[in-house]
């Protein structure tokens, strides 16, 4: 009997990716975040599509249209809050997914890793532009501050910023183009995610030990499909708890005030998931230096395969590296806290120390620890 699942041109692609895919028998729950990111993306595209049906990308009506969605559209409030808090869940999953890759040495799959970094940048760009759309105070001033950073680029900076703005300030043209980009980018992200998966399936998944699992593979279905469904249920539970009980917990109250170019909010800050990078940007008292540090704080991920000096792939059997990894996590949490604080003593110095520590850990301490661990293994 011929199995259609294995012969049909389209179904066999799905079959080879999600059903008969040989997977390591020992991958832990840290491997759930890839599928959770896929679910987040689908959820964001669907809720975003329904929001776009009622939203108007015009400075005069954008704020009112969001209010209209929440008050007058059937279940508009839940769609809006699922979209806003869905972004937070998306970034939680992203950080966990990247952290897993760093801990278990998954970055040695070069193509998969590099596309992953591009995906991270694309998602950050999408989230930033989405935050501008409600046209509240923080939307407007956030857009002004972040786009203005490009003026630090020598020679072409000012022209570049005005070109992005479509004028001499953040205005109607900026809002319209941000909406256009915010709408198209998730589909580009979806396409890149498929390429990400394509490259992953060329090599097969990594596993917690970092050792080849070719000798012990199990089919993806039913083992990991059921595991992914459990993860998805927990994700949706967490999202709905946030949406239904405290939808504005992660938002900024300033964004409930319509955008006013004549009135600057006392503390301009981005959404919580950008605060670590924002803290690094602010910790350098030079505009160009700050912008470079901001970009490098994410771009440094590209260097991870080059900085891998250990003879072992995973950190599972490397206690010194494990210790440094968790210090790095604590450092990022510190930066996130600092990013949300005003620029005053003692926050300035804490931010500067945490920023130095961030680059020092990744560029110096972790590769050095790996080298030390290599020599410790020679009995």
UniProtKB/Swiss-Prot annotation:
Out of the domains of life, which is the source?
A: Eukaryota
- Iron listed as a keyword: yes
Which residues participate in heme b b562 binding? 83, 182
Residues bound to a ubiquinone are 201
- One matching Pfam family is Cytochrome_B
Report how it sits in the membrane: Multi-pass membrane protein
Q: Where in the cell is it found?
A: Mitochondrion inner membrane
Q: How is the cofactor bound?
A: Binds 2 heme b groups non-covalently.
Name the positions where heme b b566 binds: 97, 196
**Molecular function terms in GO for this entry?**
metal ion binding; ubiquinol-cytochrome-c reductase activity
Q: Which residues cross the membrane?
A: 33-53, 77-98, 113-133, 178-198, 226-246, 288-308, 320-340, 347-367
The record's listing under InterPro entries reads: Cyt_b/b6_C, Cyt_b/b6_C_sf, Cyt_b/b6_N, Cytb/b6-like_sf, Cytochrome_b, Cytochrome_b_C_euk/bac, Cytochrome_b_N_euk/bac, Di-haem_cyt_TM
**Misc:** Heme 1 (or BL or b562) is low-potential and absorbs at about 562 nm, and heme 2 (or BH or b566) is high-potential and absorbs at about 566 nm.
Sequence similarity: Belongs to the cytochrome b family.
What is the protein name stated in its UniProt record?
Cytochrome b
Q: Which species does this protein come from? A: Gazella subgutturosa
Gene name per UniProt: MT-CYB
């Amino acid at each position: 009997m011929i199995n259609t699942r294995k012969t049909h041109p389209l179904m066999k692609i799905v079959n080879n990716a999600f059903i008969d895919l040989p997977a390591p028998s020992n991958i832990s729950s840290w491997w759930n975040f890839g599928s959770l990111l896929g679910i987040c993306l689908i959820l964001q595209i669907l809720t975003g599509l329904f929001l776009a049906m009622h939203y108007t990308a015009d400075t005069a009506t954008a704020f009112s249209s969001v209010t209209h969605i929440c008050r007058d559209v059937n279940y508009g409030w839940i769609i809006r809050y699922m979209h806003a808090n869905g972004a937070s869940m998306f970034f939680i999953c992203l950080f966990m997914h990247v952290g897993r890759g760093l801990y278990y040495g998954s970055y040695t799959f070069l193509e998969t890793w590099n596309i992953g970094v591009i995906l991270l940048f694309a998602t950050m760009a999408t989230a930033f532009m989405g935050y501008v759309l409600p046209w509240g105070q923080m939307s407007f001033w956030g857009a002004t501050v972040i786009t203005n950073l490009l003026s630090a680029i020598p020679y072409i900076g000012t022209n570049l910023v005005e070109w992005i703005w479509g004028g001499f300030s953040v205005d109607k043209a900026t809002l319209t183009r941000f909406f256009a980009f915010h709408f198209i980018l998730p589909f580009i992200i979806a396409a890149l995610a498929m390429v990400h998966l394509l490259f992953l399936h060329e090599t097969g998944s990594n596993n917690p030990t970092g050792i080849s699992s070719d000798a012990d593979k199990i089919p993806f279905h039913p083992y990991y499909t059921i595991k992914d469904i459990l993860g998805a249920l927990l994700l949706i539970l967490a999202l709905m708890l946030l949406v239904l009980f405290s939808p504005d917990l992660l938002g900024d109250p300033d964004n409930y005030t319509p955008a006013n170019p004549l009135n600057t909010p006392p503390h301009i800050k981005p959404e919580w998931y950008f605060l670590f990078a924002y803290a690094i940007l602010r910790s350098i008292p030079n505009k160009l230096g700050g912008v470079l540090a901001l970009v490098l704080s994410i771009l440094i991920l590209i260097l991870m395969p080059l900085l891998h000096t250990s003879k072992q792939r995973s950190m599972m059997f490397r206690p010194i590296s494990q210790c440094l990894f968790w210090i790095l996590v604590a450092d990022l949490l510190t930066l996130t806290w600092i990013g949300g604080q005003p620029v005053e003593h003692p926050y300035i110095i804490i931010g500067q120390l945490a920023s130095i520590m961030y680059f020092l850990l990744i560029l110096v301490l972790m590769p050095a620890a790996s080298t030390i661990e290599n020599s410790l293994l020679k009995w």
